[in-house]
Amino acid sequence: MISPIKNIKNVFPINTANTEYIVRNIYPRVEHGYFNESPNIYDKKYISGITRSMAQLKIEEFINEKSRRLNYMKTMYSPCPEDFQPISRAEASTPEGSWLTVISGKRPMGQFSVDSLYHPDLHALCELPEISCKIFSKENSDFLYIIVVFRNDSPQGELRANRFIELYDIKREIMQVLRDESPEIKVY
């Protein structure tokens, strides 16, 4: 079963170089052993060091980029409307499109994935008002995380986020049962 973590709205702007703190700030139940590992190739875009716990944030790649992304998100943010409008598939077909349609008030929930818990977009999203994220690791992957972003100011937001996670759990269970089957069987 997925144990997603909902970010807590006490997320404070990052004013530390402690890489462990910034991840625990948005994903408190991350396993301690995660920080004893060497940064993977995707983490290395944002941090440098022998282990994640001893790493330093890269100024341009993480700190400045997060600041730029947060400023952009704030300009695109709008209060939640009473009724959501239909969106086109193209609007939400990219990670940015997925979270952008949520923060701009076009829909109550979206999902995307990141390749690192140090991804600046993830940290910027967690600082927006009335926006929350649930984070869980993708099955069969040591570095992909699924982010379910939703609006707290809409009753549909967390409800849809929880339903998405429930359906994802079912998919995981089915894929586990079919793990030894041929790809053709898995498609059906």
From Swiss-Prot:
Annotated signal sequence range: none
Claim: Secreted is one of the keywords in the record: yes
Domain of life: Bacteria
Subcellular location(s) of the protein: Secreted; Host cytoplasm; Host nucleus
Major site of localization recorded for this protein: secreted
Alphabetically ordered keywords of this record: Host cytoplasm, Host nucleus, Plasmid, Secreted, Virulence
One GO CC term on file: extracellular region
A Pfam family this chain is assigned to: NleE
Chain's role: Inactive effector protein: in contrast to other members of the family, does not have the ability to inhibit host cell NF-kappa-B activation. Probably lacks cysteine S-methyltransferase activity due to its inability to bind S-adenosyl-L-methionine at the C-terminus.
Family label: Belongs to the NleE/OspZ family.
Name under which the protein is recorded: Inactive cysteine S-methyltransferase OspZ
